[in-house]
């Protein structure tokens, strides 16, 4: 352990992780009173940040006493103390640089004041607000991002699928002829092979799409299969269908840029297994353009979120167009929607539900925090499969990035579990124009 430090916590850290106070080891934590005032504004509502605000304030009330405002309250064994700085503090350097008395500047004032009061200890502002960190550095204050749930190396989650060359062609022939596959011990892989990892095996005369099955410890052939009218256009999409349709894999992550077919593949795979589940649920978080509240939009709650759900309906329409308008397949889809066997809605509307015997697809999962994804997964009951899709480089939430979003966090934590599979889709299949824009712009 290094020298003890003082950390001043910004509101957005608490809204990101209401358990954050437990993650600063033996260091002391300071909360400017303005942080509690800001949390009070977030208490009402059904979004995850509203829950986080309520839960943090509830636990703060249960775990502390009057010492919180003077001597400080202990956070528990092995942890430091928590202090609330009430009232204004003397911080002329801050208000000379930033005269406007907004919450951010009041937080900076506490950091500056504490830095001067506790000269024998480092005082560090912890905030997920990039702009506030820039302001802090501009006046010589120490600051950092909240990194407890950050994934350091995200490049490994964006690589193309492995191609193993120099494989004995006889082994590949045997994979083609064997339904169960070959024991992994017959292969001399130099790299670590994760459970359910998909790859291409090549020799000088043949090749095969394959997957490591952790339940049988075997390398199995991946077939190119059509699912509810959708045929895979490349190896990556074949890999996706492989893990999306395996009943032993309960949790799947599909990543990739726009146009790679993530959501379409997941929905088609779900529909091909409709008889195995009571319901197919397709949802996505609502992230308003420029982070404006959707409350100003006309209509009731369902009507307000309808524009944000349209991309999901677009994927369903793509599948419908694979069949004649009067076909049995299209009629079945329409009946499923009417009976709510197929449901497409905003993620907020399913919060708190227990999901049993459900094929659940969460789109745009890169816009969720690690805690939000954990909350969703823990709702899974018996017979449920959960699929999360997203592009970890296209994040619309202001306090998330490619290292701290819930999707990449889940992949990092689950990558060695037998029930989990991750496929990264690189090749765009929407159109030549879409592929060009994704690569160059």
Mark where each language-model region is.
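Active-site-proximal, substrate-binding regions of enzyme catalytic domains
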Residues: 3-124, 130-227
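Hydrophobic anchor at the beta1->P-loop junction of P-loop NTPases
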Residues: 254-256, 266
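Conserved coupling/interface region of RecA-like P-loop/ASCE motor cores
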Residues: 41-74, 310-312, 408-441
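Pre-Walker A (Motif I) flank of P-loop NTPase domains
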Residues: 247-253, 357
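Conserved P-loop
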Residues: 264-332, 397-418
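Conserved RecA-like ASCE ATPase "motif II neighborhood" in helicase/translocase motors
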Residues: 16-18, 338-361, 365-375
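Conserved glycine(s) of the Walker
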Residues: 259-261
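N-terminal pre-P-loop "Q-motif" helix
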Residues: 229-248
């Amino acid at each position: 352990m290094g020298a003890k430090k003082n950390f001043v916590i910004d509101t957005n850290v608490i809204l990101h992780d209401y358990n954050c106070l437990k993650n600063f080891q033996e260091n002391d934590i300071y909360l400017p009173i303005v942080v509690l005032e800001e949390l009070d504004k977030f208490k009402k509502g059904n979004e995850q940040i509203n829950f986080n605000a309520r839960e943090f304030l509830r636990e703060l009330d249960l775990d502390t006493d009057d010492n919180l405002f003077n001597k400080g309250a202990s956070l528990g064994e092995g942890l430091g103390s928590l202090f609330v700085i009430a009232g204004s503090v003397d911080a002329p350097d801050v208000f000379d640089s930033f005269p406007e008395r907004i919450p951010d500047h009041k937080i900076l004032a506490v950091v500056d004041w504490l830095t001067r009061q506790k000269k024998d200890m480092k005082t560090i502002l912890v905030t997920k607000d990039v702009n506030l960190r820039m302001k802090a550095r501009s006046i010589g204050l120490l600051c950092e991002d909240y990194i407890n749930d950050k994934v350091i190396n995200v490049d490994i989650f964006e690589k193309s699928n492995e191609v193993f060359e120099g494989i004995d062609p006889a082994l590949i022939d045997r994979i083609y002829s064997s339904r169960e596959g070959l024991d992994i011990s017959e292969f001399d892989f130099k790299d670590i092979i994760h459970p359910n990892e998909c790859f291409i095996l090549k020799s000088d005369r043949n090749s095969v799409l394959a997957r490591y099955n952790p339940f049988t410890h075997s390398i199995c052939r991946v077939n190119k299969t059509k699912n509810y009218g959708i045929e895979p256009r490349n190896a990556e999409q074949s890999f996706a269908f492989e893990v999306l349709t395996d009943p032993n894999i309960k949790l799947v992550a599909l990543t990739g840029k726009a146009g790679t077919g993530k959501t379409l593949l997941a929905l088609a795979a779900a529909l091909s297994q409709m008889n195995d589940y009571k319901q197919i649920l397709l949802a996505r978080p609502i992230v308003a353009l420029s982070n404006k509240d959707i409350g100003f939009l006309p209509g009731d709650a369902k009507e307000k979120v309808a524009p944000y759900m349209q991309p999901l309906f677009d994927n369903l329409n793509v599948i419908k167009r694979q069949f004649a308008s009067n076909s049995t397949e299209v009629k079945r889809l329409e009946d499923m929607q009417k009976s709510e066997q197929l449901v497409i809605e905003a993620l907020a509307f399913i919060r708190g539900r227990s999901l049993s015997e459900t094929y659940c697809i969460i789109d745009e999962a890169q816009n969720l925090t690690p805690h939000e994804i954990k909350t969703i997964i823990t709702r899974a009951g018996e017979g449920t499969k959960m699929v999360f899709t997203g592009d970890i480089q296209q994040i619309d939430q202001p306090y998330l990035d490619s290292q701290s979003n819930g999707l990449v966090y889940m992949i990092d934590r689950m990558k060695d579990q037998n029930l989990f599979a991750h496929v990264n889709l690189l090749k765009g299949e929407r159109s030549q124009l879409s592929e060009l824009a994704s690569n160059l712009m």
